[in-house]
Amino acid sequence: MHKLTKKGEISRIMHGLYTKTYYIDIVDEYFYPSVEEVVQKLAQKFNWTIALGGEATLNYTGVSNQVSNVYIYVSDGPSREYIYRGRKISFKHTNKKYIKQRSSKFAVLIEAIQRIGKRDLYDKRIKKLAFFAQNVKEDLLKDTSNIIFWIRNVLLKIKEINENK
């Protein structure tokens, strides 16, 4: 790896991760993988199940329009932080039952509900979450029996809203 790096055929992204280098003449720069690609490779390398986390879930679900400058993901692995090209990537450990054997959209929905919290879940936000939940493949009644009570209640409200449309 060291020799290939010295030759310029590959470049080290971070400890243990390398990429083939591509030079783009038009912009006179090297091409590097996106943060999302690096996140996926880290998850693959450590065999983690991951899903979007933090403030980004609120943006992704349509609850908020703020964009975080830190890339936060929930995972079934340990909590870790990495720096990639000046950007912080943070993996936060979460209970496996929220992300294992579930769709990534369902995991994002759960994370968004947790991020908002019990006290700040008012009707407008629940309706936005319900709109997002239309694309979730899990049954919000049957597939949520092992989820924390207050989160399950929110999911049942979301299911009710979507059924009444």
Task: Give short role names for the model-derived ranges.
Residues 1-42:
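Short beta-edge/loop segments at beta->alpha junctions of small alpha/beta modules
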Residues 9, 62, 114:
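Hydrophobic/aromatic-lined pockets within catalytic cores
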Residues 12-16, 39-84:
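Short gly/ser-rich loop at a beta-strand->alpha-helix junction or flexible surface loop bordering the NTP-binding
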Residues 26-31, 44, 83-85, 135:
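Alpha-helix boundary/capping detector
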Residues 29-36, 47-52, 103:
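Alpha-helix initiation and capping sites
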Residues 83-93:
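A short, charged helix-loop
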Residues 93-165:
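Hydrophobic alpha-helical interaction segments
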